[in-house]
């Protein structure tokens, strides 16, 4: 049960990201909001790649300024994984390996960062990346990470959605529907309305395929 790396695709609008960083806004908030723009309002793959490459650079710059800020590490991992999905090609596996290292560092130092988002992100990599000998994909590790994410954030939209997606790909339809239904009822994130809207569309799509 391995997905092509293209399923990890996401994008960002670099022009607006640049102005947001320049304005003195919290880089974490900017990254989160612009990621939602990339993921759900992207116009084409080339734009995804260009914008995400530049966002990664700015994420790295922000992390240099605050090297102990684990939230920025989580999002750097998410952005690298997203670029791997958007670009594919020979560099994709290197990007997801870099993302894996970042997420493992967060889990080791501050596992509850962003409500356990490192577990959710690492779990999704484990079931989407090809397994040995190509990559590090591992369904058992995927389920372990995703269930840990749910222990930390049992009502969150993302951990419930990604665990449901994993279950669906594993052929566990009934369980997947249960977690998708729970994801639909997740409390809204006041600072991330676009991300919530886009995720709910993905939830509805997967539910439609399973029912």
Give a label for each model feature.
Residues 6-16:
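Bacterial N-terminal signal peptides
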Residues 17-58:
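N-terminal leader/linker segments that initiate helical-solenoid repeat arrays
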Residues 44-60, 92-101, 135-143, 179:
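Helix-turn-helix repeat elements of alpha-solenoid scaffolds
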Residues 72, 115-118, 159, 193:
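TPR alpha-solenoid repeat register
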Residues 67, 111-113, 154:
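Short coil turns that delineate tetratricopeptide repeat
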Residues 31, 36-45, 82-91, 114, ...:
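Short coil/turn linking the two alpha-helices of tandem helical-hairpin repeats
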Residues 57-64, 107-108, 147-151, 185:
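Conserved structural position within tetratricopeptide repeats
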């Amino acid at each position: 049960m391995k997905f092509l790396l293209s399923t990890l695709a996401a994008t960002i609008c670099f022009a607006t990201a640049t102005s947001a960083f320049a304005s003195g806004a919290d880089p974490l908030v900017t990254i989160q909001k612009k990621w939602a723009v990339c993921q759900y309002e992207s116009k084409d793959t080339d734009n995804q790649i260009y914008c995400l490459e530049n966002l990664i650079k700015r994420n790295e710059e922000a992390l240099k300024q605050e090297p102990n800020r684990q939230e920025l590490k989580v999002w750097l991992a998410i952005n690298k994984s997203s670029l791997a999905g958007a670009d594919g090609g020979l560099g994709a596996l290197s990007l997801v390996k870099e993302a894996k290292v970042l997420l493992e560092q967060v889990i080791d130092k501050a596992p509850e960062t962003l409500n356990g988002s490192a577990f959710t992100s690492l779990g999704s990599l484990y079931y989407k990346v090809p397994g040995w000998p190509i990559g590090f994909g591992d369904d058992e590790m995927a389920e372990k990470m995703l269930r840990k994410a749910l222990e930390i954030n049992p009502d969150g939209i993302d951990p419930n959605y990604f665990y449901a997606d994993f279950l669906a790909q594993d052929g566990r339809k009934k369980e997947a529907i249960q977690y998708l239904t729970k994801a639909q009822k997740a409390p809204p994130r006041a600072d991330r309305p676009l991300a919530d809207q886009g995720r709910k569309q993905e939830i509805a799509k997967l539910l439609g395929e399973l029912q």
